[in-house]
């Protein structure tokens, strides 16, 4: 949406009258809707820009169902932003870091540091909520400082909440080495041992208890942190059996 508004803004000043995108801070938004006043530009031209960007997104991100459309609506009323404030919102959307920032040097293919813009909305004021994740605390702090600096440059304010500590990967783990053969014996298959890029309770526990050896297990969850998230019920029973057997052997 930021890219779309930026392209329209290059042709004519804009005033945002409403902005709604995303519903959860830690999830990638599925849709975004904006009402605006475009002074002196016809709807046909705006739709041409939308169509061009839609084709680019479908090709670049392999999203054949991605849709960008413009409609002629009554955009007046509500909390309309000035052209200057609208320009700052567009600058934020286009300039803020987003997505993968660094990959792990220990585990190929593992994201080490990332963030996403989860919620953006215009109420009494415009607000944007980012979720920042990293398995290295120093990198997370650096990314948070980038967001703080960007807010300051655009005459905005910055606040932070819901922080959880990083859970750094341990190359040696007695608990992990104990659980692998138990899984193999129970299910006749090789367990898939992975490091993941997510905020988990293990990070909180390991921060409080120095040297804690911990492993995260759970049932199969598909399309996590999206509107299509769902749980495989049969895997819940398998996880319970596995947990009981691990506890017997500790």
What are these regions (language model features)?
Residues 135, 166-170, 230:
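Short, contiguous acidic/charged loop-to-helix segments that flank catalytic cores in large enzymes
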Residues 2-11, 42, 84-94, 101-102, ...:
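His/Asp/Glu-rich mid-to-C-terminal helical/loop segments that flank catalytic regions of hydrolases
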Residues 129-155:
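C-terminal, non-catalytic macromolecule-binding modules
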Residues 125-134, 158-165:
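Short, flexible active-site loops
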Residues 1-132:
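Midchain, well-structured core segments that form catalytic/ion-binding scaffolds
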Residues 105, 112-114, 118-127, 131, ...:
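Zn-dependent metallopeptidase/amidohydrolase metal-coordination segment
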Residues 26-33, 78-84, 168-181, 204-208:
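Short glycine/threonine-rich loop-to-helix capping motif typified by GTGT followed
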């Amino acid at each position: 949406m930021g890219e779309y508004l930026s392209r329209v803004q290059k042709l004519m000043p804009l005033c945002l009258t409403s902005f709604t995108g995303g519903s959860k801070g830690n999830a990638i938004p599925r849709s975004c809707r904006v009402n605006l006043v475009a002074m002196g530009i016809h709807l046909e031209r705006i739709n041409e820009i939308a169509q061009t960007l839609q084709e680019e997104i479908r090709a670049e991100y392999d999203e054949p169902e991605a849709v960008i459309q413009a409609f002629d609506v009554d955009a007046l009323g509500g909390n309309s932003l000035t052209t200057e404030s609208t320009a700052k919102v567009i600058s934020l959307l286009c300039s803020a870091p987003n997505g993968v920032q660094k990959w792990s040097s220990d585990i190929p293919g593992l994201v080490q540091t990332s963030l996403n813009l989860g919620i953006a909305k215009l109420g009494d004021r415009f607000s944007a909520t980012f979720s920042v994740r990293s398995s290295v605390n120093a990198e997370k702090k650096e990314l948070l400082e980038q967001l703080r600096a960007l807010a300051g440059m655009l005459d905005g304010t910055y606040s932070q909440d819901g922080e959880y500590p990083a859970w750094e990967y341990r190359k040696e783990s007695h608990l992990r080495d104990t659980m692998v053969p138990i899984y193999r014996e129970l299910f006749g298959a090789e367990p898939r041992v992975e490091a993941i890029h997510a905020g988990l309770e293990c990070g909180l526990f390991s921060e409080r208890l120095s040297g804690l050896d911990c492993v995260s297990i759970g049932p199969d969850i598909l399309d996590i942190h999206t509107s299509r998230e769902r749980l495989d019920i049969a895997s819940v029973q398998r996880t319970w059996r596995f947990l009981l057997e691990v506890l017997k052997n500790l």
